[in-house]
Amino acid sequence: MSAFTGAAIAAGKIAIDDSSVLIVVDVQNCFLPGGSLAVKDGDQVIPVINRIAKGFANVVMTQDWHTPGHISFASAHAGKKPFETIDLPYGKQVLWPDHCVQGTDGASISKDISIPQAELIIRKGYHKDVDSYSAFTEADGKTSTGLAAYLKAHDIKRVFVTGLATDFCVAWTAMDARKAGFETYIIEDACRGIDANGSLAKAWADTAKAGVKRIQSSDLAIA
């Protein structure tokens, strides 16, 4: 059950119940200050996520989990630099610095994340020849992680997305959640973006067009 009763719900707040899930996207060392693909102020999402997670009975986490020499790494493409875009068989791909390589400390979820009730970790990006931003579907748009079926089997109706980075893995996760039929929210102050070449503004426009709602943690009825 959720961590509060109906009597505690303030006017205008969004109630969290057993049909709600919090998805915590990629709060991993590589994306935090000092990491190989650090998101500016990425560590600031951690206390916000820890606080709001206390109000959710259902929590799913994701973990970027790349092979060495992954197709999304600039180092895998001769003459290419990080943040350049190339065409791959499944579409356009931003090339990244090597990050979140399987089994490395950089791929570990931050030790400061404290969510003991988290029930599932979805690892993504572990197929060498296709990237995966979304917790639901790989970047080819066809290969499912199984998360949508898992959530539906647990009678989840609403998805709340947090984590790193707003304009890539968070946005893609939110749009795929909406596509799968879930009422979907991005909690803005529990996310941070990379903002490469206008990617953050585009992500907000794309998610709004998809029907994803943009809220703050203060909009939730969590004590």
Give residue ranges: language-model regions:
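N-terminal export signals
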Residues: 1-11
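Short, hydrophobic/glycine-enriched beta-strand segments
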Residues: 20-26, 31
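Acidic/histidine-rich helix-loop elements
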Residues: 32-41, 134
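Active-site alpha/beta core segments
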Residues: 47-158
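Histidine-anchored nucleotide/phosphate-binding helix
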Residues: 48-52, 170-179
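Short internal beta-strands
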Residues: 60-63, 183-190
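Short, flexible loop segments at boundaries between secondary-structure elements
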Residues: 186-200
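Short acidic-hydrophobic, aromatic-tinged amphipathic segments that line or gate anion-handling sites
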Residues: 213-222
